[in-house]
Amino acid sequence: WEYERIPGFGKIELNDIVVFNYPSGDTCLTAPQYQAADFYGMVYQIGSELCNPVNLDSMSFAEQQRVYDFYYKVGRKYINDHPEQFGKVISHPVDRRENYVKRCVGLPGQTLEIKDGIVYLDGKANKQPDNVQTNYVVELLQPISAELRKEIRLSQEDLPEQMNRPGTHIFPLTPMAAELLASNKAVAQSVEKYDYPYYEWLYPMNLHTGWTVDNYGPIWIPAKGETVQLTLETLPFYERLIKVYENNDLRVKNGAIYINGEKAESYTFKMDYYWMMGDNRQNSADSRFWGPVPEDHIVGRPVFIWLSLDKDKNFGQFGKIRWDRMFRSVKNYN
C-alpha cells in the first residue's frame, strides 16, 4: 500500500540536528561492499568511466542532458550485467531506509550557497557550529602522541598508524584543534586549510555545474505551495523531487517538459524540503550529494545521547564507555 506518515508535532528549525531517512537509499545493491554506497552516484561514475571522455564545458544544457542520460544507461546496464560483482539491485520504501543524522542548514524557501566552506542563506552567512570540522593539510615533524590526539579529538580512524608519521597528511579538525596543533611546533611544521578539488558527482548529478563541496550553489530549496519555473536549465535541480518524491510522471520530449502527460512550464511543490549537512564538512555524505530532503523523510530530532563508545578502545578496556557524554542533550553540540 501507499506509504504514509502521521504528521509530527514539532517543527524543524534552522541549525537543528535532525534524524531522517536516507533519500538516495530508495535503490541499493546487495553486495556487502556496495550496500552503503550511493547507487546513483555509482551508476553515473561507472557509466562515465566506460565512455569516451567529453568536454562538457563546451556543451549546451540539452547536450549535457543527453550525455548524462547515456552515462546512466551505460552504468545501469553494466551493474545489471555483473551481479557476481554488485549483487542484486533492490528497492527500499522510505521507512526501511537507513537513518541519517545531520544538521539542517537550509529551510524551505531559502536560497543556499556555500562560499569557501561557509553556508549562506539568502545572501547572509549562517552561524557555523562550534565543533564543525574541515580538512587541514598538516606537515608532521613527529608522530602525534596519544594525549595530543585525544586533546584535538582525532580518532585512530582519522589518524591511522601509517599516517601518524613525519610527512604531509590531511586530517579533519575543528578550528580550535587546528590552532592547537599549529601552536605545537615540535609536532607540526604547518597546518593549512585543505582546498577541496572539483568532484563531478555532486547534486544534481546530471548537470555539469563546476561546484565543489566548499563552493556550491546557489540553489533554491523548495517550499510547499511555492512554484518554480521549469526549463531545461532548471530541471536537473528539481527533476528527482518532482518524479520520485512527489510521484509524478515527468518526461522531456523534443525539448519540452511534460508532467503527467501535460506540457509544463512550471511546477508547484506539494512538500517542504530541507538542506542537511554534516558537521564534518568535507567528509560528509549529505545534501550536497543527494539534494534536499523531503518532509516525509524526516523522522525527528535526537534528544540525548544514551550511549557513547570510544571506537579506539576495545570492550573491557578502561575508557571504552565515554561517561562524560552519556545522557547529554544533543543541543550541547550546536
What are these regions (language model features)?
Residues 1-334:
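Extended hydrophobic leader/signal-anchor segments used for secretion and membrane insertion
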